[in-house]
Amino acid sequence: MKKFIIQGQVYTPGGVIADGVVVVENGRIAAVGPRAAVDVPPDARRLDAAGQRVIPGLIDLHIHGLLETSARSDVSGLAEALPRYAVTGFLPTLGSSSPQDTLQAVREIAAAITTKPRGARMLGLHLEGPYVSPRRPGAMEPFFVRPFSWEEFQALQEAAQGHIRLLTIAPEVPPARQYIPQLVAQGVIVAIGHSDATYEEAMEAIRLGVSHATHVFNATRPFHHREPGAVGAILLHPGVTAQVIGDGEHVHPAAIALLVRAKGAQGVALVSDAMPLAGLPPGEYVSRGKRLLSNGRAIRLPEGQLVGSATLLNGGLRTLVEQVGLSWTEALTIAAAVPARVLGLPTGRLEAGLDADLVILNDDYQPRLTMVQGEVVYQAA
């Protein structure tokens, strides 16, 4: 049984404990509190944060890749790399592709989930495409966008061994809407995204069971005061959790502030939507035959269209705190607690009884140490 005592500025849902400790035993948090008030096991290994922040591990519900590693080609490599960016859990995410390629990718990710590679935990799979609107494909290949097929999805879920946890759909494209209750009954979290839905269409989808929104504001019919669209429904309905990309370019910090004011921190989930170029130096790259430009924050085509983010969740956390102006408590709720709640997992907060997924973070938002279920999976040199 491994035991650890982590000392530092401990960030709990109730606030910051300036001289706090987290006791970890057998993969779970055994105790959290002021150092003077917590009984420390004498045989525990001490990990001193040297006054730096001890935060819950971040959870990314939407990531395609980083460091030239993609969810399609090497999801185990993705899991290994993410703890360097304060991420302890994630949903590898697939966009639109041919039925054969989608099936193969799903099968390979499911096999990796089963083997449980070292690093950040794969918490399931996010199928962002192909069941989206041809009017709002974003950076997806429009050729592969197609209407929802119950038969195809069941084959994909079987190949995934039941690991498809999150499914993005455009509910206004028939026949997607009619299958929402059945998907929810199977335990799938249904999200609206890449959608041209009107306000009424979006609200009807929410009534049927949609409870999540994929990268709100992006690749979705924009808000208009005479036709609020899906964005209006997402902002208004308390039962919908909204993903937001935190690179400061996909969504202006002021828009993120408005989103949090409308829904509260408990209604927002930070995501990266990071692409395989994330983590690489700014510059010009060629990926799958396309020229792409990265400024280190976001990735664009030469003509300026956004195709994905180059910012991981630790960078998104910086955006929430330094540009949006949120408190650390609010920012960590959005980056850790809400994603954990969406997935129904006992993590995302530094509380006794929860999984010991935590990070020692320096003032530059870089992890000094990342722990997943009580195992140190990354430690800075």
Regions found by a protein language model. Give the residues of each.
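Metal-associated gating/positioning segment near the N- to mid-region
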Residues: 49-105
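Active-site gating loops and adjacent loop-to-helix segments of metal-dependent hydrolytic enzymes
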Residues: 57, 80-91, 133-161, 203-216, ...
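Active-site mouth loops of central-metabolism enzymes
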Residues: 61-73, 139-146, 189-193
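Conserved, mostly hydrophobic/aromatic
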Residues: 51, 62, 127, 183, ...
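Active-site metal-binding motif and surrounding structural segment of the metallo-beta-lactamase
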Residues: 37-54, 158
